[in-house]
């Protein structure tokens, strides 16, 4: 049995679709699965069982990447095609059964929207897979030695990045002697290009308790390292979804984005947001997303984030 699974080029959306892939892996354990996705998430899907091929789609002018994918897949008679990109290509190849992204209820979480496409109930939760090499690299990044608080202080847009000084204060509160993670080590995670923000946070942590995972790992290795941590707190980002997918208790910090769509998924997760909505944060005169250089999340207080983290931590054993 052959399955073609077409998913996102972006890390966050790609991770949110892993539950759908896992659904088909479990439903058809004999299947050979080809995944088409962006280069950034190719390593994540390459770890999955039953995935025999990953086609990394690099966006090209005139949508040539779709034409190239069509050339690579047209010669196969697919039993199932899952297209979460709603591409024309999935309609031009032979398949006995197709699941194609269409109009969705924008009030529902992305995981629920994906579940509706593939007729899965309950919605399959995102999940990640790791081979022995990935686990060994994660162990080198976050060695054993007591609980670790993982922090993701960056995001793909300055507007939805909580100020670095707030992260520093939050870390100090949560690792205080009378708090939930007294004297815990702190691992700071960030991707290449996010070093400036991330190092502001890392350098404020006592040297003996800091773990530097800034621009030092691919998404799949970073996710494996987060799996070793006791708690993850970070901005709305692909890394936040990785943390949730590996089962680490995850607190997402939201400002000018949509928690109803993109909050971290799972009972082991929570989110806290600015008092203002996306529209309220971005409706000021002269707003242009391309020219925003600073955080739009100043109204999310450290006290609110700390309270949400403590509440999440206290309810985890009850899950």
Show where each model-derived region lies.
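Catalytic machinery of carbohydrate-active enzymes
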Residues: 1-319
């Amino acid at each position: 049995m052959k399955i073609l699974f077409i998913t996102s080029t972006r890390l966050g959306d790609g991770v949110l679709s892993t539950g759908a892939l896992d659904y088909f892996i479990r439903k058809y354990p004999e299947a050979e699965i080809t995944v088409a996705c962006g280069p950034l998430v190719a390593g994540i899907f390459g770890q999955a069982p039953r995935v025999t091929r990953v086609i990394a789609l690099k966006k090209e002018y005139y949508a040539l990447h779709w034409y190239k994918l069509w050339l690579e897949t047209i010669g196969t008679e697919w039993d199932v095609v899952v297209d979460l990109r709603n591409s024309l290509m999935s309609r031009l190849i032979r398949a006995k059964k197709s699941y194609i992204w269409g109009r969705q209820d924008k009030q529902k979480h992305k995981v629920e929207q994906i579940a509706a496409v593939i007729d899965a109930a309950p919605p399959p939760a995102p999940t990640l897979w790791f081979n022995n090499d990935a686990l060994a690299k994660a162990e080198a990044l976050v060695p054993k030695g007591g609980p670790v608080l993982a922090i993701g202080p960056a995001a793909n847009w300055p507007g939805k990045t909580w100020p670095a000084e707030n992260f520093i204060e939050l870390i100090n509160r949560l690792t205080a002697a009378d708090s939930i993670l007294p004297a815990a080590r702190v691992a700071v995670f960030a991707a290449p290009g996010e070093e400036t923000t991330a190092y502001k946070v890392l350098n404020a942590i006592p040297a003996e308790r800091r773990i530097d995972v800034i621009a030092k790992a691919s998404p799949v290795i970073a996710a494996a390292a987060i799996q070793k941590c006791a708690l993850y707190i970070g901005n709305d980002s692909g890394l936040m979804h990785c943390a949730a997918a590996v089962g680490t208790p995850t607190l997402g910090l939201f400002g000018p984005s949509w928690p109803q769509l993109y909050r971290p998924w799972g009972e082991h997760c929570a989110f806290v947001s600015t008092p203002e909505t996306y529209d309220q944060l971005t409706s000021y005169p002269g707003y242009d997303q391309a020219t925003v250089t600073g955080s739009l999340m100043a109204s999310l207080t450290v006290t609110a984030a700390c309270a949400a983290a403590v509440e999440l931590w206290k309810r985890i054993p009850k899950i």
